[in-house]
Design a protein with these regions (language model features):
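A short hydrophobic beta-strand segment most commonly corresponding to one strand
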Residues: 135-137, 194-217, 324-334
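Short acidic-glycine-tyrosine-enriched beta hairpin
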Residues: 174-185, 298-315
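Loop-centered beta-sheet repeat module
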Residues: 164-210
Length: 334
């Protein structure tokens, strides 16, 4: 009898462990000096400081992990969840990465961000001990007249780049782009860029927190000192040519080795339900930009609302999203 009981118990325990999950995630917040209050007022985020510049919605990065906010794993970091349940929850397409591949954020730019650049993997691993950073931006909301910087107007030399930084004339050669709600930008590592004030951005990026500031409007940080610039490293990694206008992502809004992003729009009337499958190849990340409804998979259902971050583990099988939903769906390609 005891053997039968033990075998039954082991079988049930294994099934429980194997049962895939829909995780609602709680973010870490950042109070950078350019942030505002829109993520609190309009997206229900929690703020501990004077402002909320970013929320790291899907993150295993030590500088700001996201936390499981539902079920028996509530309170654990996403990294802890993955360590306990095994890398199979990420999918076979993630096996080529040594670490969790992506980081997703909401960004509230009440003021201009610094002019900056991110290194590629080779440079970042050698000099910073972490991955480089290719990213994409989806403009969730934009005040009238909002803009950002994306690459150069024309190709310049590294020498001219360095000289313009020194002479404070860099903005003259940067590509200033008017921005509207729904715009998408793909920012390859090495592309100089900056988010302007009055923008809410959803960002999908490599799992990295390496930024080289080039120009910061002479601002001081919370310590009263001018924020550090990283001129030498920035000159080394910057591609001094105009950013590529790359339409090869279609039908996705972004598609690269690190992430594939699709846009979902359920209006609640003509289109009020999406049905799909989460295979064993990749997890599915759902970042809800607007709306509310229910996500169901594998016998589990969770409600969602504007601002939520949902993680469906690889191998979850069939799922449905029902209701009103404006969202970014992120997977990892082969």
């Amino acid at each position: 009898t005891s053997d039968i009981y033990r075998e039954t118990y082991i079988s049930i325990s294994f099934k429980r462990r194997k049962k895939m999950a829909i995780l609602k995630l709680k973010p870490s917040g950042k109070d950078y000096i350019w942030g505002g209050h829109k993520l609190v007022d309009n997206y229900g985020k929690e703020m501990t400081g004077d402002r909320l510049a970013e929320t790291w919605e899907l993150s295993c990065h030590p500088d700001g992990p996201s936390f499981v906010d539902n079920g028996e794993d509530a309170g654990k970091t996403l990294r802890q969840y993955i360590e306990e349940h095994g890398k199979k929850v990420l999918g076979t397409n993630c096996e080529r990465f040594e670490d969790f591949p992506i980081l997703t954020k909401f960004i509230d730019a009440q003021d201009n961000l610094s002019i900056q650049v991110h290194p590629d993997n080779e440079y970042a691993l050698k000099n910073e001990g972490q991955y480089g950073k290719t990213e994409m931006w989806y403009v969730v909301d934009a005040e009238e007249g909002a803009y950002l910087y994306h690459g150069f107007k024309k190709e310049i030399s590294k020498d001219e780049f360095a000289k313009r930084i020194e002479e404070d004339t860099l903005l003259e050669v940067l590509n200033k782009v008017p921005v509207h709600k729904g715009d998408v930008f793909f920012i390859e590592a090495g592309t100089i860029h900056a988010i302007g004030k009055g923008l809410i951005i959803a960002e999908i990026q490599q799992n990295s927190n390496v930024t080289y500031r080039v120009y910061d409007y002479g601002r001081v940080g919370k310590d009263g000192k001018k924020r550090e610039l990283h001129i030498e490293k920035a000159v080394a990694v910057t591609n001094c040519a105009p950013a590529k206008k790359d339409d090869s992502h279609y039908p996705h809004i972004a598609d690269c080795d690190y992430f594939t992003v699709d846009k979902l729009n359920l209006d609640g009337t003509t289109f009020n339900k999406l049905e799909g499958t989460v295979s064993e190849k990749s997890f599915l990340s759902i970042l809800v930009l607007d709306g509310e409804g229910t996500i169901t998979s594998n016998g589990e259902s969770v409600s969602y609302k504007k601002g939520d971050s949902i993680f469906l583990t690889a191998g979850s099988g069939e799922y449905s999203i029902e209701g009103v939903c404006d969202a970014l769906l992120t997977t990892i390609r082969e």
